[in-house]
Amino acid sequence: MYQKSALELRNAVVSGESSATAIAKYFYNRIKTEDNQIGAFLSLCEERAYEKAAIIDAKVARGEPLGKLAGVPIGIKDNIHIRGLRTTCASKMLENYIAPFDATVVERIEAEDGVILGKLNMDEFAMGSTTQYSAFHPTKNPWGLSCVPGGSSGGSAAAVSARFCPIALGSDTGGSIRQPAAFCGVVGFKPSYGAVSRYGLVAFGSSLDQIGPLTTVVEDVALAMDVFAGKDDRDATSQKFFTGSFQEALSLDVPSLIGVPMGFLDGLRDDVKENFFASLSILERQGSRIVEVDLNILDHAVSVYYIVASAEAATNLARFDGIRYGYRSPEAHSIEDIYTISRVQGFGKEVMRRILLGNYVLSTERQNVYYKKGSAIRAKIIQAFQKAYEKCDVIAMPVCSCPAFADGEILDPTSLYLQDIYTVAMNLAYLPAIAVPSGFSREGLPLGFQVIGQKGKDQQVCQVGYSFQEHSGIKNLYPKGCNKLVDGEVK
């Protein structure tokens, strides 16, 4: 059963081949047997899941119509609210916070008969690219337990890779869906800004954040987006971009012109560069034409991103002060102590580093030098993409300059920030992007291929990703070496 896609599991429930309860039980068995070595989940919601599964099975028995996600097990990143469950953001600051409402994406999942299994680990407040910054435990990469799974949605990527669920929700502020997807050999999709409601997502960078799915195959991205996408009046930034179905769009003709920023590929490791150009050749053989585009301004994207993201994070996280929200230190005996001691004890080092950076670039003395200048360069990045799209339909890039690295191999914060060089620009420019598995590094670790589209043309991005998947034959990758559980039995 672990080899089935979300769409195949849904069809099994609809046909009566399997029940939603049996599917939920099977995947909980996998999680309880295997997740102790991976650490993908922070919490499970078995009672809620089995209640939902029983409702679905009763619908089947009565012959009632079923939702698009009927019986599909889904994991939720722990910065997305599920009413009555903890939303910790993998932080001591919110360790005991119980969400009072459901996020819009959670409402839409359950309205379409999806079965939510639990909350997934992440870098604290989504700040990081390793999922080693969780306050509770690190997550390991199913392809190599000594390697990081990427981040900040590392728990989501690891859960899908290890087949704990066929769909997981993540959030992407600067690559936090796509980079872990590439590291763990799964598909990760960042929709256009505003395509999926952010209501119920704990904000990191409000002009950058976007919720999206991680799956084993592109077809399941399309299935998920047909549920998640759409305007939501509770999120002022949400828009209605799409009229047709994502699933139907996969069968349409693939765009013919693919732009490649050749001048932006110098930092790639040799085997990663070779894999990228081999991936382009697969699309060329299907009739696409490669054209060079000028995106050299993206050399500044990481600097701009960390100015903008840190400024927005400092503002968004100001509410977590031990008074309005979050951990209050028992050592605090005055208002000043509550603010200072609670935040020092409640936040991890990386979160504090970014809050300090954000407050610095927003300070009166430095705002013009950093924040306003960074915002101006962001506008030029958007213009550069617009000009590039005059020559092509979509743009292709690697996801990362290297495969997953060992835990502790990169400790310098600046070096870790540079890991985002091929992903942050899409968030700065509000663009949709998909990461699909494209093969393996010389160490045998997964690599990813990234397709970026114009804002609102998410379906076109998925078309190209699907075409690449089908013609490369690289799909449904499974790290057999790290799992003992096969078909419900421990081997």
From Swiss-Prot:
GO biological process terms on file: translation
PROSITE patterns referenced in this protein's UniProt entry, alphabetically: AMIDASES
Entry keyword rRNA processing: no
InterPro entries (alphabetical): Amidase, Amidase_CS, Amidase_dom, AS_sf, GatA
UniProt keyword Transport, yes or no: no
Keyword tags: ATP-binding, Ligase, Nucleotide-binding, Protein biosynthesis
EC numbers on record: 6.3.5.7
Positions annotated as active site in the UniProt record: K77, S152, S176
Domain of life assignment: Bacteria
GO cellular component, one term: glutamyl-tRNA(Gln) amidotransferase complex
Catalytic reactions on record: L-glutamyl-tRNA(Gln) + L-glutamine + ATP + H2O = L-glutaminyl-tRNA(Gln) + L-glutamate + ADP + phosphate + H(+)
A GO term for molecular function: ATP binding
Similarity section: Belongs to the amidase family. GatA subfamily.
Subunit and interaction comment: Heterotrimer of A, B and C subunits.
Function: Allows the formation of correctly charged Gln-tRNA(Gln) through the transamidation of misacylated Glu-tRNA(Gln) in organisms which lack glutaminyl-tRNA synthetase. The reaction takes place in the presence of glutamine and ATP through an activated gamma-phospho-Glu-tRNA(Gln).
Protein's name in the database: Glutamyl-tRNA(Gln) amidotransferase subunit A
Gene (name only): gatA
